A protein has these predicted regions:
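Cytoplasmic helix-loop-helix junction between adjacent transmembrane helices
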Residues: 44-82
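A membrane-interface helix-boundary motif in multi-pass transporters
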Residues: 99-118, 219, 258-261, 342-368
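Extracytoplasmic gate region of multi-pass secondary transporters
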Residues: 177-242, 298-302, 306, 333-341
């Protein structure tokens, strides 16, 4: 998935939105073969990663095409929250679906559940291929909407030459290797590398944390309720994406400056995770709420850093930079999750003590 972030982004450079969507739909194919053995499951997960990794660069580029700069973080936060909605819906839809197919004698139930869920990707691909058009050629976009979308290119204070230069900038082609010559590319790279691990650590390790510290197995009602609440809290990121627009409307700052101010605010909230473990001695709800807030802040921050790409690069290059940032975030997340697992194993084996905590809880406190 880390590598195919770049593949998907390169397809977007060529404006092959439909072709890229077809690649993303390969995730649906993967779902249908991940049902026989562990090895098939691993192979299917690889194919799924190839398909899903290209979706995000395409989504960011489409956001840049359909929204002015001041609204892009908000729109990004909305579609970014879609994965959270899916995570909330999965536990209450997929198991009943599997049980239904099992009850009517279709294998063990899970096989058909994989096929049905994977088939949704092809439906989405069809809608995308037949309905999506750029705003300037989309008959469903009226003149007023198009004027709003293109407001960044229609500044009355700019001369015709300046507007022409801005349009040329948006259409400028920058090769993949040339992107690495710009310090802005490395700013996005480092920003994603250093921060994506926060989200993926909490996403991956919170069920284990609930089990290790509080003894609630992931299939118990209490554990599922805690995870549901955590995901629900992260939905606050939608409102976080609105903050730059509010700052722009109230202060008149340019989109880039407003985004920097909003990102500084969001960057402070994950520090609350330092209190998750100590407060967890009183109730397991405290760490869940704190982790949810930290996750929401990270998602808001991430929506803004992706929107910053549109402030610094031409539209034709946005998908490439987003793909590079996604790759960096994947590498950083891999390092943090792998390192965390090793630390937790070491803490459990040695009964390590740290700041009043012993064993795995000590390891969790160090990572938090």
């Amino acid at each position: 998935e880390i590598t195919t972030r770049l593949v998907g982004s390169e397809m977007c450079i060529r404006d092959s939105h439909n072709a890229e969507e077809m690649l993303s739909a390969t995730g649906a194919v993967a779902s249908t073969i991940a049902i026989t053995s562990v090895y098939y499951f691993i192979a299917a997960r690889i194919v799924l990663g190839v398909g899903e990794a290209g979706n995000f660069p395409a989504a960011i580029k489409v956001t840049a095409e359909y929204f002015p700069k001041k609204d892009r973080a908000y729109s990004t936060s909305i579609f970014n929250a879609g994965s959270t909605v899916g995570a909330l819906a999965a536990p209450i839809t997929i198991p009943p679906l599997a049980r239904y197919f099992q009850s009517i004698g279709v294998g063990n139930g899970w096989e058909m559940a994989f096929i049905v869920i994977g088939g949704l990707g092809f439906i989405w691909m069809g809608l995308w291929m037949f309905l999506y058009k750029k705003p300037n050629v989309n008959p469903r976009v009226n003149a007023a909407e198009l004027e709003y979308i293109e407001q960044d290119n229609n500044n009355p204070e700019e001369s015709a030459e300046q507007q022409a230069a801005a349009n040329d900038f948006d259409n400028k082609k920058i090769s993949f290797l040339q992107c690495f010559k710009f310090p802005q590319t490395w700013a996005v790279f480092v920003g994603k590398f250093m921060t994506d691990g926060v989200w993926w650590f909490f996403l991956f390790w919170t069920p284990a944390y609930i089990s290790d510290v509080y003894g609630f197995a992931s299939d118990t009602g209490t554990a599922q309720m805690l995870i549901f609440v955590l995901y629900a809290i992260t939905m606050l990121s939608i409102y976080g994406g609105k903050l730059p627009t509010i700052i722009i409307n109230k202060t008149g700052k340019n989109p880039y400056a407003a985004r920097m101010q909003a990102m500084l605010i969001f960057a402070l909230f994950p520090l609350l995770a330092l209190f998750a473990q100590p407060l967890g001695n009183y109730s397991y709800w405290y760490p869940i709420i704190i982790i949810g807030i930290a996750g929401a802040a990270h998602q808001s921050w991430s929506a803004n850093i992706y929107s910053v790409v549109g402030d610094m690069f031409p539209k034709s290059t946005i998908a490439t930079i987003v793909g590079i940032g996604g790759m960096a975030g994947g590498i950083g997340s891999f390092c943090i999750n792998m390192g965390s697992g090793r630390l937790f194993d070491y803490a459990a084996e040695t009964n390590m003590t740290f700041m009043g905590f012993e064993g795995k809880p000590a390891g969790y406190f160090i990572i938090f």
